């Protein structure tokens, strides 16, 4: 698992953010899902491979999974975070959900087997055979695919768009019989109104939408929220946008206790840009110096005169002369 995936999963394990992601993406910011009603439940599922023994199983792991408990009702919410477009994603999500339902079903069957064995229930023949009581119910599973990559999502958004109905020559008939399985897709780079989010998910999504646009980032960082980020949000932004300088110099931009103890990304970004400009000017000066040395060599100036005119060391002149000789050989 890459550092980006680990970073995003850790970021979303926070119940406030997890609830905000669902509320902001699906309910226009309305607090339908409450953090205090969530219980972390991320886990792996054992899936038997075909043509292999029962002991040979493949582990499928949920990225982030939470139980939502509201009164006597239990729901299962899960997020699959994607940095790259996955053209198999609708099937993957359907499989994760199926594994979750199978897990619940096995637990019900085990419970009912004990009750039947202890003669605490009187099942019908059908109930005994399947070990599921007519009144048994499963908990609904809701899986969201969160795409936070740079490129537009050009993959399928439901099972329908992975099908080849025309291949059999009966496209219309096949499509009428087919039962779709929609995928719950949220693309960070398609978010235009982020006011529905009320945690630092908003700041992360905004920065992700400005990747590659320095002026856009500068304008965005005028928002005072970026002047007082939490350490985890700082690290998430630095990792997902591939800014190693922000991770290296993190402590440098931490505010004092009186200032709020947050991290000031606005100041950090401005300093990084200033450093880049300084490096660019220095590289420009070096390129200009190299060009002058080459011209003086071509005009047969002595090394002593070149050193005096350009204020460089003999080693620099030798390197320029050697580089020019290599070009002539090529």
For each predicted feature, which ranges?
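Elongated, amphipathic alpha-helical interaction scaffolds
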Residues: 1-330
């Amino acid at each position: 698992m890459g550092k980006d995936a680990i970073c995003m999963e850790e970021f979303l394990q926070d119940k406030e953010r997890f609830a905000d992601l669902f509320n902001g993406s699906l309910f226009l910011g309305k607090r339908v899902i409450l953090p205090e009603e969530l219980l972390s439940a991320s886990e792996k599922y054992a899936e038997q491979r075909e043509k292999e023994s029962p002991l040979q199983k493949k582990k499928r792991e949920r990225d982030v999974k939470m139980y939502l408990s509201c009164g006597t009702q239990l729901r299962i919410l899960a997020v699959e975070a994607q940095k790259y477009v996955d053209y198999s994603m609708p099937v993957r999500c359907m499989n994760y959900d199926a594994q979750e339902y199978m897990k619940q079903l096995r637990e019900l069957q085990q419970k009912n087997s004990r009750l039947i064995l202890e003669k605490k229930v009187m099942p019908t023949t059908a109930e005994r055979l399947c070990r599921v009581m007519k009144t048994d119910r499963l908990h609904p599973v809701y899986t969201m695919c969160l795409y936070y990559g740079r490129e537009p999502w050009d993959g399928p958004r439901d099972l329908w768009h992975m099908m080849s109905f025309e291949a059999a020559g009966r496209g219309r008939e096949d499509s009428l019989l087919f039962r779709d399985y929609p995928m719950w897709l949220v693309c960070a780079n398609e978010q235009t109104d982020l006011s529905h989010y009320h945690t630092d998910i908003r700041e992360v999504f905004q920065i992700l939408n400005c990747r590659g646009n320095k002026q856009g980032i500068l304008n965005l960082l005028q928002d005072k929220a970026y002047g007082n980020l939490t350490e985890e949000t700082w690290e998430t932004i630095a990792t997902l946008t591939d800014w190693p300088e922000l991770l290296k110099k993190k402590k440098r931009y931490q505010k004092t206790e009186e200032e709020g103890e947050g991290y000031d990304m606005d100041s950090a970004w401005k300093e990084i840009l200033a450093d880049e400009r300084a490096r660019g000017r220095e590289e420009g000066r070096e390129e200009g110096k190299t060009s002058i040395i080459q011209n003086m060599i071509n005009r047969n100036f002595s090394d002593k005169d070149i050193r005096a005119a350009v204020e460089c060391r003999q080693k620099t002149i030798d390197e320029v002369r050697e580089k020019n000789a290599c070009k002539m050989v090529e």
